[in-house]
């Protein structure tokens, strides 16, 4: 029996007047085994509320969540992580994937692994770095971000097995960059290239976010999927977002 996963990312409830309440009410949890939320859900104190809304709506499902970059804005990594730990304690169906995995029970059920992923250190030009809000909005961002990236890369390269489902916020391959962003000076902050790992370890699915463009592509035997919403009320909302996007795996 296949698992049914619903994929959402980059909901950015901080841009919603009601902080996502009406949006969550419009979602259909019927028959969903796992709701996958691939980061950038809400910022600051709004994050626990947003997680609770989704967990209540999907009370018969698991909610698998990886942190994006925006959840850390205006806070420290330690404070944000503690907020999510507390939310997972208060919502029994919430699973925070932080270099960790869940194994669904039952015949044919697959393992789901996840991490934010982030990006490796590289000698960027100052203009590119100045354009990325992460460096100014997240307290103690450097060198913390590079350690988190190293940790995630090592974990995924070591743990992924054929047929697994992987969830990250950041893009795991340059192949996943939308055509309009090819050549952008910001791509090194959006992509951590795991292409060799994908080809070698052969997960069945890799689900991601961060970019605000839908993506359906293939690397070897792995389907690469992204279903982001974007910023409500702006030019950066994804016109191809599908709030009913369900994958059978």
Regions found by a protein language model. Give the residues of each.
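Active-site-proximal loop/helix segment associated with metal-binding centers of metalloenzymes
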Residues: 111-184
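Binuclear metal-dependent phosphoesterase catalytic core
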Residues: 2, 92, 104-106, 178, ...
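Active-site neighborhood of phospho(di)ester-bond hydrolases with catalytic His/Asp-centered motifs
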Residues: 7-9, 35-40, 64-69, 95-99, ...
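Charged helix-capping and loop-helix junction motifs
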Residues: 49-53, 79-83, 184-192
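N-terminal active-site segment of His-dependent metallophosphoesterases
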Residues: 1-65, 71-79
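Glycine/small-residue-rich loop that forms an oxyanion/phosphate-binding "nest" at active or ligand-binding sites
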Residues: 75-98
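Active-site environment of divalent metal-dependent phosphoester hydrolases
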Residues: 12-18, 42-48, 70-81, 101-106, ...
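Beta-strand-turn-beta hairpins that frame and shape the catalytic cleft
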Residues: 1-6, 101-114, 119, 163, ...
């Amino acid at each position: 029996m296949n698992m049914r996963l619903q994929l959402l990312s980059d909901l950015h409830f901080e841009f919603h007047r009601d902080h996502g309440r009406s949006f969550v009410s419009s979602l259909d949890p019927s028959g969903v085994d796992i709701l996958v939320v691939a980061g950038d859900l809400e910022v600051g104190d709004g994050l626990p509320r947003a997680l609770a809304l989704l967990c209540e709506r999907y009370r018969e499902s698991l909610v698998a969540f990886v942190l994006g970059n925006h959840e850390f804005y205006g806070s420290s990594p330690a404070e944000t992580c503690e907020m999510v730990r507390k939310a997972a304690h208060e919502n029994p169906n919430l699973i925070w994937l932080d270099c960790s995995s869940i194994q669904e029970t039952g015949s044919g059920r697959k393992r789901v692994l996840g991490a934010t992923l982030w990006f490796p250190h590289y000698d960027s030009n100052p203009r590119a770095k100045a354009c990325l809000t992460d460096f100014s909005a997240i307290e103690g961002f450097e060198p913390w971000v590079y350690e988190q990236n190293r940790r995630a890369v090592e974990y995924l390269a070591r743990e992924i097995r054929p047929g697994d489902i992987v969830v990250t916020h950041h893009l795991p391959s340059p192949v996943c960059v939308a055509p309009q962003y090819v050549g952008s000076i910001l791509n090194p902050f959006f992509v951590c290239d795991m292409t060799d790992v994908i080809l070698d370890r052969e997960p069945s699915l890799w689900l991601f976010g961060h970019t605000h463009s839908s993506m359906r592509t293939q690397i070897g035997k792995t389907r690469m999927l992204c279903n982001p919403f974007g910023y409500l009320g702006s030019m950066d909302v994804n016109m191809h977002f599908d709030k009913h996007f369900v994958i059978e795996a």
